[in-house]
Amino acid sequence: DTFDIPADLIPRQFQQVIRHCLEKNPQKRYQTAHDLALALKAIERGQWQVSSGTRKLWPSIAVLPFIDMSPEKDLEYFCDGIAEELIHALSRLRGLYVTSRTSAFQFKQKALDVRLIGQQLNAATILEGSVRKSGTRLRITAELINTSDGYQIWSERYDREIQDIFLVQENIAGAIVENLKIKLAAGFDQPLVKRYTEDLEAYHLYLKGRYFWAKRYEAGLSKAMDFYLQAIERDPEYAPAYAGIADCYTILGSYGFLHTKTAFDKARAAAEKALELDETLPEAHVAAALISFWYDWNWELAEQSFQHALQLNPNDSPAHIWYATFLSMMGRFPEVEVEIRSAQKLDPLSPLVNSLAGCALYMARAYDEALLEFQKALDVDTDFLVALSFIGSVYIEKSMFNEARAAAERAVKLSSRSSFSLASYGSILAVLGHTEEAQSVIAELQNRSKEQYVPAFCFAMIHIGMKDYDRAFAFLEESLQDRNIQICFLKESPGLDSLRSDPRFRALLHRVPFP
């Protein structure tokens, strides 16, 4: 049987999804079942507004990755770079709320209705565009769309030589300011798109570095660093490239891929050089903050650097979420909530932002809320390693032991058995009473340590789970000597609660200058 349902009884948002499924042009339909599921989830979560009233989101914008229309399809890094440069430029405007890169780029190569994208990103307008290259000529199109009704506000086509890319970006940013009626601050007389180099090849190398840095895995970081170094060879005064190198080394050091001292000494040199060249570069201040936080244990300077970065760019979601992480380590949990919400407003679909929010809430012992944040991250990316690596600790606190083991096993597999994922897995096995399996993980890490760096904290985690506290304290002592970043967790981490009554733990705490 069939039923005729009056159109006015079908929610407007669901009608839009159906129309999208029935588009005559296949390219305009949902390209995968996952894309359709995203649309339906948005309705389920109430992210579509049922009322017909206009949302008060103005002025706000999400810049989507530009589409590579070149026959060779070899400009993905360049298309991403244009969008990212525009995000950076627009983020400097005080009167405009700008969705961060990670969330905007979740819609890369997805044929979704801009109204749905606007709802998911909480953005009143969308900027999208395309790039076609022929020889030394570029054709760049850009279109600004109102997400409440899908209508075009502005569009333009630029046919230029490739060396004019900075001028094109400036023109696009200026058109957005004009069309969204953004009032520039008094005395704001500088270009919206800051030009850090006149060397076009250095600029391309930097964009390639950003492309690989965004992947955030060890091989990608190595490639990113190589491109940044090549950019610096061409232009030794290219400040963002130095900031990029600092970012890479802080990640490599924090993930345990490099010895802490090696990583943070190199990160410090790069961050200081970036700030020497341009003290207004927000990402360089964030890198400096992380070095002061994770390695120097200079909490006052770390906080000053975080706050300076946010003064320079209030739309910097990584700065907000790393500042939240810092505040959680300091036990300042009411302030943590403010920074988490600021980061999530700017970057609602970022798996990293939501995972770090989960970590901060775990430190606050808000386990139900932490679990929700990790699950939000995994809803977007089911294989997101940071979420999988930490959600197990929350499951343990909630006595969800099967889930804890399953998450840890996935993290080990997806990370190609990285040291930290193995340590987390080993500690969970130990807590579950699987001592023999936990011992085999220790043996694997010991064999690895003969050829490459394995942070001492990895061994400490497993011995804590086994209640072998003498060995755990020996490895914690080594971790303190090496300044493993996990030492910053000593004061607040629930995973260390079993040690807190031990005089050795209190003595260890006194050697770290916690406030």
Language-model regions, residue ranges each:
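Residue-level recognition of oxygen-bearing side chains
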Residues: 13, 35, 335, 471, ...
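Amphipathic alpha-helical protein-interaction segments enriched in hydrophobic
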Residues: 419-424, 453-464, 488
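C-terminal lobe helix-coil module of Hanks-type protein kinase domains
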Residues: 1-48
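TPR/TPR-like (Sel1-like) alpha-helical repeat modules
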Residues: 477-484, 513
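TPR/TPR-like alpha-solenoid helical repeat scaffolds
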Residues: 426-433, 487-503
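Acidic, proline/glycine-rich low-complexity intrinsically disordered segments
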Residues: 2, 50-421, 429, 437-449, ...
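K/E-rich alpha-helical interaction surfaces of small helical-bundle regulatory domains
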Residues: 153, 211, 495-515
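Residues at helix-coil transition
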Residues: 19, 23-26, 45, 181, ...
